[in-house]
Amino acid sequence: MEFYHSDCLYLKGDVPCLPHKENGYHCMDCPVYTKISKRILIIKLGAIGDVIRTTPLISTYRNMFPNCKITWLTMTPAILPAGKIDEILKFDYASAMYLQHAEFDIAINLDKEKEASALLLAVKAREKYGYVLKENISQPVNELANHKYHTGLFDDVSQANTLNYCQEIFAMCGLTYQGEPYLLDNHADKGYVWPDIDRTKTVIGLNTGCGDRWTTRLWPKEFFAGLAKKLLDKGYEVLLLGGEQEDARNREIRDLSGANYLGFFPLPQFINLIDQCHLVVTQVTMGMHLTLGLRKKIVLMNNIFNPNEFDLFGRGEIVMPDKDCVCFYRGKCKLGESCMKDLPVSKVYEAVERVIAL
């Protein structure tokens, strides 16, 4: 009977491994046999931006445990860097069934959704971190998750928080965040070309939308148009960014300002479009996380979130309205009009000039 290494990092179990396909190796005398040092499961299902800003954990675990095998469960597999993660699973019935019977050394759930917490409860692991299902709700699996959990329950605790998101999730896992970067594929290998971008100029991207959930974040389109005009007058190439939801808005801003708008694209192509920019002006959105993941300069407009939450990695600046926001983590302004109208174009423009000079 043919011998095989069940603990080898390359072994798939259902198909031939890469060393066999490329070199014909068999397990008995395989020169590249690599014993798995740790099996690690990360459950991070939710919003694309939150998935991106959880990726610094990968580098830390790779450094701690060379030859570890990392499995990641998510709703959006396409956003994860395939070359950095051994097994990427989309959250569905098949993946949930598999994981309930798999075994790990470390299992982490960073989502408070009940299905994610229930899965961590069911997973077999020597160490568990984050949230599990207790009394039919998501609760901390241990005291390490208490801080992050409490910031999600009490607004005053969240407003007093001085830790950024990565510091919080690292602490949940018993780790210390040391500025590890986001990991994101720029999709440069896909052959995307952008002939309509003037590369002789510094390219400033304006990410104009903010999604449906937190509309209090939205900067008025007239303000974006005014900023675009000032940047164009200064000699920058101004590129409007957004998805299908922002298409009509971006067309209007283009018509008002003369900024460049190329349309909306599938996610990998949109990521590559952002990669063409030197700096991006954005609200707190997926586009913000993509910008940081691509290591671009950034001017971040924020009103309803604790600014301590965001690590810009020394490549940007946060600008806020001139009056205090009273709608902390609210999707709609309780005063009837968002304070983003109190964030003047001149303030954002001056921040762009400072950051581009970094």
Model-identified regions with their sequence ranges:
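Catalytic machinery of carbohydrate-active enzymes
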Residues: 1-358
